[in-house]
């Protein structure tokens, strides 16, 4: 081991480094390096990935933690961490530098450098005349821990730079160490580094000029090359510095916040006290013996693993939400914990599902438990600010999410860097079918005109492939908080997020998990917002106060289940997707646990494991149910002998193959990543032999293993499904009994769910609910319920729907609105300051009470002549009426202004105008026979292409009577690519298929009718 690389930037030095940290650490090990320092610019974002790669691949190379800084254009250096104190110091330096600036920037001060007491400093001379001045300054403050880092990149002035550095070292008595200034793990990444540099500077590679690297010397180099470039003592000095650096990320220890413990309690005793209180609330009739045993088992393991603070922290957060009237629900593996149920973190009664605590906490796993809590998405910020206020910004921050290049951004950015016209890039992106599993995007690019024999074409494809997955920047996690007992910046650097009042750490959830650090997930859920708004509306209009618990106590309401069985579930949580709605009439849920199964079974795991059809056949009595043993029956009886949930796989491994709880959970984790690393196969022998030893047939053992592989990364936990089923039933109950309130709440909670406001309004109208247009005199910002003269409730659309109408405009409109309403448009013009606001109201036809039509309203908005004396004698506009817009023009204007229309559906309108050939409507399909030829026409309102569908795409078309489910096979989409990719109004000629109450059309011919809409563009929602 001849060398330690002490200056190496990964791709977490965004748009500079051209290799992943994992690639760098593996290549350094391959080249025989003693150590490698990942030193990204003012960042530690990549160090955990390198650390994990060493462990995963059992590498001998040592990782050194450090960071590269530019104090200014003349002074640059690397800081390395010899020990834990130096690491805390480095985190503090990075935090201070980042917090001084907006997101993505940093500003280091001279005081930051002067105050260093523990970090090792490698100064990197720039070759400028000011180097002597900076050497003097650095020597004054950091002499005992200061080196001169000599880089050799074989530029035209390399010999001059070499002499310059040696002179400085002699003059200031600085030891020299060899440094690579590494930006890539292999020389082949040079074109990518050029491309990244061009993206960073916003120009093409050809325009970079002197900013372009002239060679690939800033890659990890071989021993032979390094020995030619550097003196032996310079290489040896790198090893000496590496020997000083003993800090290891595994030495980081998380300390939980402690202020939640009242006097007289220990963390353990206070948790037990809260659980005792919770038992009385959750089990007023007394705790069943089996549940009590589970509670004691959980508490013992929580105490042993030293997790009480974690549970107390979550409990404190949800109690705050409860006090503030914010709806919340714990979900995920936490629903496997009776302790969480007693602490009111989760709402799933453990008597209703088979709880498996090993899925939540495992002694063998030795990791912090994962508790996800969803809060109303419109009020989650209150919870976040409570956490900041309680613990302070020094001790609480959000985890990061690494935003990486995906296909579209990669094509755009690489294409621009190579000088490809933006119109051509748009053409590529518009016509590439990413759902095509057989013809990759590379093949499709060639079909679209990219020349594979040209150098630019070859570079383009290669660079797009390489850059996909590269980090672009750090963003904030959806809600993962890290809270510590001491300053968080001593554990990990903290920086500003893009949102005001938010700070994030430089690690993501996977980094935290790798280091076994606690993360509190404060997530958001739109359905909780909708449910709360629905409850408030019910109380307002019916004087009935409801809660989720009130509804879930009525879990066997067959009227609700009949609605669900008919797949009348648009807007219903978790069972509103195309796939779920197709399964509902087949599975026919009739109780809460059926919903739990329903939510979990329409997942890639059960589908790939071939578990759906056996379950349905057994449920319908078409296939016998048998169990090889009583133990297996106890695990699988509730799902008719078919493993559907992750917990069942874990339990099967325990009862049938003799796995411990921790081993079984390791099996679950291997299942989650088996396609990536194949780790699940190391359990195959143990699983099958364990079953054979216990008397099970080889065929059964192998079938179970195949089902485990089928689950893959898509297996769904029962606890997760059980939590979701609570909200699914609650939202279905509200839709059935209070539809007007339900739709209004959904519309006021957008964006959420699968459906656009237009689709929700269409469904509300199909359910007989009157929907009233936006009106300048009656609307509010949000949609509201109003009572008609008939006594029925109707939905009045709100101002928030209008595109281009400002918040200030809405506020002024309402503040100054007279009790009797506005009498003329000129009144509104005097109140609204921005002409755009008045024009937006006119375009949305919000003046329909004051002007006969929107054209006339627009004219009056623009008409200022009567305000000028010269024109006061001209005839009034009323004597020269404008032509009224046609019904069709009104629909176009509605969609353009608000995204929906209350007028006649475009399909019906086009048919009346004679613009459509004969077709079958959605409400007529149930009269068509199985395998009959049909023609359907509708607006494309949804596309789904699940990963398990083998290239199949599921379209949702909407006509004036309802939704039509269309199945498009891959061969069809390839042959008719233009209509498949771009149609907004689509005609499908195909074969109707019927399975029970499930009807869909298998597409044969796709015809794009979008031109007939002449500007109408209801956007479809696409889900991949």
From Swiss-Prot:
It is found in: Cytoplasm. It is an enzyme of class 2 (transferase). The keyword Nucleus does not apply. It catalyses: DNA(n) + a 2'-deoxyribonucleoside 5'-triphosphate = DNA(n+1) + diphosphate. Its EC number is 2.7.7.7. Keywords: Cytoplasm, DNA damage, DNA repair, DNA replication, DNA-directed DNA polymerase, Nucleotidyltransferase, Transferase. One of its GO terms (molecular function) is DNA-directed DNA polymerase activity. GO terms for cellular component: cytoplasm. GO terms for biological process: DNA repair; DNA replication. Pfam families: DNA_pol3_alpha (PF07733), DNA_pol3_finger (PF17657), HHH_6 (PF14579), PHP (PF02811), tRNA_anti-codon (PF01336). InterPro entries: DNA_pol3_alpha_NTPase_dom (IPR011708), DNA_pol3_finger (IPR040982), DnaE2 (IPR023073), DnaE2/DnaE/PolC (IPR004805), DNAPol_HHH (IPR029460), NA-bd_OB_tRNA (IPR004365), PHP_dom (IPR004013), Pol/His_phosphatase_N (IPR003141). Belongs to the DNA polymerase type-C family. DnaE2 subfamily. DNA polymerase involved in damage-induced mutagenesis and translesion synthesis (TLS). It is not the major replicative DNA polymerase. This is Error-prone DNA polymerase.
């Amino acid at each position: 081991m001849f060398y330690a690389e002490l200056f190496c930037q990964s791709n977490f030095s965004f748009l500079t480094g051209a290799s992943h940290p994992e690639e760098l650490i593996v290549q350094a090990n391959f080249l025989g390096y003693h150590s490698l320092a990942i030193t990204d610019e003012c960042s530690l974002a990549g160090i955990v990935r390198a650390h994990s790669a060493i462990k995963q691949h059992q590498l001998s190379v040592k990782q050194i933690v450090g960071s590269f800084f530019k104090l200014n254009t003349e002074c640059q250096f690397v800081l390395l961490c010899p020990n834990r104190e130096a690491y805390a110091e480095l985190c503090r330096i990075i935090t201070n530098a980042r917090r001084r600036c907006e997101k993505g920037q940093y500003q280091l001060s001279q005081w930051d450098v002067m105050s260093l007491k523990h970090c090792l400093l490698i100064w990197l001379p720039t070759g400028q005349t000011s180097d002597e001045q900076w050497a003097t300054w650095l020597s004054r403050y950091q002499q005992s821990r200061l080196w001169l880092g000599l880089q050799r990149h074989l530029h035209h002035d390399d010999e001059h730079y070499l002499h310059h550095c040696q002179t400085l070292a002699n003059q200031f008595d600085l030891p020299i160490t060899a440094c690579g200034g590494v930006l890539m793990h292999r020389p082949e990444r040079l074109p990518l580094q050029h491309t990244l540099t061009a993206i960073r500077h916003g120009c093409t590679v050809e325009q970079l000029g002197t900013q372009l690297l002239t060679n690939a010397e800033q890659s990890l180099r071989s021993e032979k090359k390094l020995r030619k470039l550097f003196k032996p003592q310079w290489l040896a000095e790198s090893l000496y510095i590496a020997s000083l650096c003993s800090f290891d990320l595994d030495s980081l220890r998380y300390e939980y916040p402690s202020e939640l413990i009242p006097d007289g309690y220990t963390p353990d005793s206070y948790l037990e006290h809260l659980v005792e209180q919770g038992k009385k609330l959750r089990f007023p009739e007394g705790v069943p013996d089996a549940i009590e045993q589970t509670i004691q088992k959980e508490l013992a393991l929580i105490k042993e693993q030293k997790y009480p603070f974690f549970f107390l922290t979550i409990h404190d957060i949800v109690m705050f939400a409860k006090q503030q009237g914010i709806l919340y629900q714990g979900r995920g593996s936490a629903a496997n914990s009776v302790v969480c149920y007693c602490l009111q973190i989760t709402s799933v009664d453990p008597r209703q599902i088979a709880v498996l605590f090993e899925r939540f906490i495992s002694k063998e796993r030795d990791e912090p438990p994962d508790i996800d809590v969803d809060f109303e998405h419109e009020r989650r910020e209150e919870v976040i600010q409570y956490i900041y206020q309680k613990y302070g910004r020094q001790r609480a921050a959000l985890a990061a999410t690494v935003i990486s290049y995906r296909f579209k951004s990669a094509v755009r950015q690489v294409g621009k860097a190579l000088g490809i016209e933006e119109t051509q890039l748009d053409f590529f992106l518009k016509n590439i079918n990413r759902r095509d599993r057989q013809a990759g995007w590379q093949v499709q690019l060639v079909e679209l005109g990219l020349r594979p024999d040209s150098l630019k074409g070859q570079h383009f494809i290669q660079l797009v492939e390489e850059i996909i997955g590269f980090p672009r920047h750090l963003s904030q996690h959806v809600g993962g908080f890290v809270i510590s007992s001491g300053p968080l910046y001593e554990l990990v650097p903290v920086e500003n997020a893009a949102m005001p009042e938010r700070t994030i750490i430089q690690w993501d959830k996977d980094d935290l998990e790798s280091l076994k650090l606690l993360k509190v997930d404060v997530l958001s859920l739109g359905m909780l917002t909708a449910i709360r708004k629905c409850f408030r509306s019910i109380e307002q209009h019916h004087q009935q106060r409801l809660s989720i618990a009130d509804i879930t106590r009525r879990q066997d309401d067959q009227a609700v289940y009949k609605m669900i069985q008919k797949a009348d579930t648009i807007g219903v949580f978790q069972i509103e997707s195309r796939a779920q709605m197709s399964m509902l009439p087949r599975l026919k849920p009739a109780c809460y646990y059926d919903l739990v199964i329903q939510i979990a079974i329409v997942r890639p795991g059960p589908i790939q494991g071939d578990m759906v059809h056996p379950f349905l056949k057994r449920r319908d009595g078409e296939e016998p149910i048998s169990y090889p043993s009583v133990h297996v029956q106890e695990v699988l009886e509730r799902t008719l002998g078919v493993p559907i949930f992750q917990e069942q796989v874990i339990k099967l491994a325990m009862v049938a193959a003799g796995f411990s709880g921790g081993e079984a959970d390791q099996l679950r984790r291997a299942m989650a990543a088996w396609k990536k690393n194949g780790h699940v196969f190391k359990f195959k022998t143990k699983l099958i032999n364990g079953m054979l030893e216990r008397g099970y047939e080889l065929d059964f053992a192998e079938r179970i293993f195949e089902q485990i592989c089928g689950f893959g990364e898509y297996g769904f936990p029962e606890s997760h499904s059980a939590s979701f089923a609570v909200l699914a039933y609650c939202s279905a109950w509200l839709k059935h009994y209070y539809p007007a309130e339900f739709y209004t709440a959904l519309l006021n909670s957008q964006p959420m769910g699968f459906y656009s406001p237009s689709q929700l309004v269409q469904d509300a109208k199909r359910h007989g609910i009157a929907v009233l247009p936006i009106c300048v005199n009656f609307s509010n910002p949000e949609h509201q319920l109003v009572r008609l003269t008939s006594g029925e409730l109707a939905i009045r659309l709100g101002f928030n729907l209008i595109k281009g109408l400002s918040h200030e405009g809405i506020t002024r409109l309402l503040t100054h609105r007279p009790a009797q309403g506005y009498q003329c448009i000129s009144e509104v013009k005097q109140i609204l300051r921005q002409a755009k606001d008045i024009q937006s109201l006119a375009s949305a036809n919000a003046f329909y009470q004051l002007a006969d039509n929107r054209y006339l309203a627009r004219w009056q908005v623009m008409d200022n002549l009567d305000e000028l004396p010269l024109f006061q004698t001209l005839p009034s506009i009323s004597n020269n009426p404008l032509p009224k817009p046609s019904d069709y023009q009104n629909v176009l204007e509605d969609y353009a202004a608000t995204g929906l229309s209350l007028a006649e559906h475009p399909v019906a309108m086009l048919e009346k105008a004679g613009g459509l050939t004969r077709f079958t409507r959605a409400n007529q399909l149930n009269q068509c026979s199985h395998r009959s030829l049909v023609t359907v026409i509708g607006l494309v309102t949804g596309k789904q292409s699940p990963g398990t569908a083998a290239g199949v795409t599921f379209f949702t078309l909407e006509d004036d009577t309802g939704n039509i489910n269309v199945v498009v096979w891959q061969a069809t989409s390839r042959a008719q690519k233009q209509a498949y990719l771009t149609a907004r109004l689509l005609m499908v000629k195909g074969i109707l298929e019927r399975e029970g109450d499930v009807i869909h059309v298998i597409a044969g011919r796709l015809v794009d009718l979008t031109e007939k809409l002449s500007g109408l563009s209801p956007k479809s929602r696409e889900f991949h």
